[in-house]
Regions:
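Dynamic "connector" segments at or just before major functional cores
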Residues: 1-233, 255-258, 438-477
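Structural motif
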Residues: 54-63, 319-320, 390-400
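Short, glycine/acidic-rich hinge or "gate" loops at secondary-structure transitions
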Residues: 83-85, 98-101, 238, 417-427
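C-terminal, non-catalytic "cap/extension" segments appended to globular domains
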Residues: 382-396, 410, 414-477
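Acidic, metal-coordinating catalytic cores used for nucleic-acid/nucleotide bond scission
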Residues: 241-248, 268-270
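Short amphipathic alpha-helical "interface-anchor" segments enriched in bulky aromatics
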Residues: 34, 82, 340-391, 398, ...
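An anionic, glycine-rich sequence signature occurring as long contiguous blocks
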Residues: 1-16, 261-365, 468, 472-477
Length: 477
């Protein structure tokens, strides 16, 4: 036992260090329960290609995947954090393959193994960076959303899902392969594509791209793949919603040829401004004290388009501004299928995707910092390997997909918490108010006691029972 005394004006504070099993991240147990119900780490470990020598394996692939997914979900973004939390009792209980007391104590009463170290996680990310493993990670990213949906929907797919497509700047430090200066964001960034499900709030797919690419580069292939996969496991019909950077002829024609409904904003230019000019007049009468919006329908063929398409002019009035504002939407829906007001309402719900992007960057904070400098020789022999630049980029993409999986797992717990407590909750709030709970772990002959403060214990028991009742078992609702 270590003691330290600090004298103050009115009292003496004493600090003691005791060999007890304590934790500041008890929320890892909630994530493990949700992960068990989803079957995420278990099923993912079965299909990921593991090229390690079995005779030298200390941590199973399932344990390493749990570590790589749960730590970001708890708010720990760096690989070094695994060393800091290596002996945290609750985190070890949550991540270990062993059940019960054996997760913390060996049969000879010695302390069981801790979490995988930072070098171990580096090797994991490198192993997951192969083309096959990244494809598997992507499939399970979509599958995680599908399983959560079916758990609350009687095992059925949803009838209709809107997929939001956008790019996201991720700033990096140092010289990372693929990170390039982007003048629009005035920073060194990666510029990945991200697809989210508007009605669900889950991330469906991500694709890492160099920082200087245009917003729409590689967009069509990415979108069609997401839609194809979503309609197999998530919904019967998937529609696409895009921002102004995506609707070029290739993308629109590709979506129409596959029968995928879409709505997208179009960038204003001199031609569109001239077309809108006759409609930018206020209606007769006294201006209202609140803003108002009206729409105009037309069909028009842009010079770069192969045919005319339905355009909707959106005009907005702000009482505090002298001039009217306007923007344009293009859509594949006919007026009978979705009239202008419905279309505008649909597009404005794109704010849910912006919220997902913000939460991903604020709460999970993907750390894309792999810059491999591989050895060229070992004991006089040349080592065959992929180029360091290409491998580092692939490792960063694998880390981004794992961050998205961490977001979906935390989101699954967040959705249960919102229903249990009847109030909204952000991922950051979930991490700070529910996950970061101090606890003492005590071991008895046949059980483990998690001792929480009395004011949080009741809330925790409610949330635990709700997660445990979800129909995630064996990956089926």
């Amino acid at each position: 036992m270590k003691e330290s005394h600090v004298s103050g004006r009115h009292s003496i504070v004493q600090f003691e260090g005791r060999p007890e099993r304590l934790s500041c991240e008890t929320g890892a147990l909630l994530l493990r329960e949700a992960d068990e119900r989803l079957g995420l780490s278990r099923d993912l470990a079965r299909v990921v290609e593991d090229k390690r020598d079995p005779s030298r394996v200390v941590h199973s692939m399932e344990e390493l995947l749990r570590t790589a997914i749960m730590l970001p979900a708890l708010g720990w973004r760096d690989q070094d954090d695994a060393d800091f939390l290596r002996w945290d009792a609750a985190v070890r209980l949550a991540i270990s393959d062993r059940r019960g007391i054996s997760a913390l104590l060996n049969s000879d009463k010695t302390e069981a193994k801790g979490l995988g170290s930072q070098p171990t996680l580096c090797r994991l990310h490198e192993g997951l960076s192969s083309d096959r493993n990244r494809s598997v990670l992507r499939e399970f990213l979509m599958e995680s959303a599908a399983r959560r949906l079916k758990a609350g929907n009687g095992g059925h797919r949803q009838r209709y899902v809107t997929i939001d497509i956008d790019s996201l700047p991720i700033e990096v430090d140092g010289s990372q392969p693929g990170a390039e200066y982007n003048g629009h964001y005035d920073a060194e960034i990666f510029h990945p594509l991200i697809a989210t499900a508007a009605e669900l709030g889950d991330i469906l797919d991500v694709k890492l791209r160099p920082g200087s690419v245009h917003t729409a580069e590689g967009g069509l292939e990415f979108i069609l793949n997401v839609v194809r996969t979503a309609e197999k496991s998530l919904c019967q019909v998937a529609a696409v919603r895009m921002d102004a950077g995506f609707p070029d002829e290739e993308t629109l024609q590709g979506l129409e040829s596959q029968g995928v409904p879409y709505v997208a904003r179009i960038k204003n230019n001199a031609v569109f401004d001239a077309m809108a000019e006759p409609y930018l007049t206020r209606p007769r009468g006294r201006p209202p004290t609140e803003g108002r919006t009206w729409t105009c329908e037309m069909s028009y063929q842009v010079q770069s388009w192969s045919r005319a398409r339905r355009l909707v002019l959106i005009i907005t009035e702000n009482p505090r501004e002298l001039f009217l504002n306007h923007f344009w939407l293009v859509t594949s829906w006919t007026e009978d299928e979705k009239h202008a007001e419905e279309l505008l309402s649909c597009y404005r719900q794109r704010g849910t995707a912006e919220g997902v992007f913000g939460e991903l960057m604020d709460s999970i904070e993907p750390a894309l910092s792999s810059n491999r400098r591989p050895k060229s020789h070992y004991r006089g022999q040349t080592i065959p390997h992929r180029s360091g630049k290409n491998l580092s980029f692939a490792v960063n993409e694998a880390r981004l997909i794992l961050a998205a999986l961490a977001f979906n797992l935390a989101h699954a717990v967040r959705c249960v918490a919102e229903k249990a407590f009847q109030k909204g909750l952000t991922i950051k709030g979930l991490q700070e108010k529910i996950f970061k709970v101090a606890a003492r772990v005590t071991l008895h002959a046949r059980r483990i006691n998690i001792i929480l403060a009395s004011d949080v214990c009741e809330r925790w028991l409610t949330l635990w029972s709700k997660i445990n009742c979800l129909g995630f078992a064996n990956g089926r609702a």
